[in-house]
Amino acid sequence: MSNLKVAETILSQLGGNKFRVMTGAKNFGGTEDSLSMRIGRNSSNSNYLKITLNSMDTYDMKFCKLTRRFEEKSVTEYNNIYNDMLTDQFTAHTGMYTSLF
């Protein structure tokens, strides 16, 4: 059993490779309870996303703009998001669709 199982599950709930291609997501990183990534240019000016599994078995999404010195600016957080709402919340915040269908 991999300690990145949660990160892999989050990515599959977002749409897997379709999500990666549609959003320009790259530089994925995972921990025991989270997935983080850089995302492409979007209407919110966010370029970094971290999704964390919390103790209530729901997700917390943190969008921010990382500067070249890795400082976080314009941080927006959404808490207690269910797995079936991840893609809808992502689309609502960034304006990017996560798949064609």
What are these regions (language model features)?
Residues 1-43, 72-73:
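Negatively charged, low-complexity tracts enriched in Asp/Glu with abundant Ser/Thr
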Residues 57-68:
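Short, surface-exposed beta-strand/strand-loop-strand elements in extracellular ectodomains
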Residues 67-101:
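Mixed-charge, Lys/Arg-enriched low-complexity segments
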Residues 52-56:
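Short beta-strand micro-motifs enriched in acidic
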Residues 37, 61-63, 86:
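Generic structural hydrophobic/aromatic packing signal, biased to beta-strands
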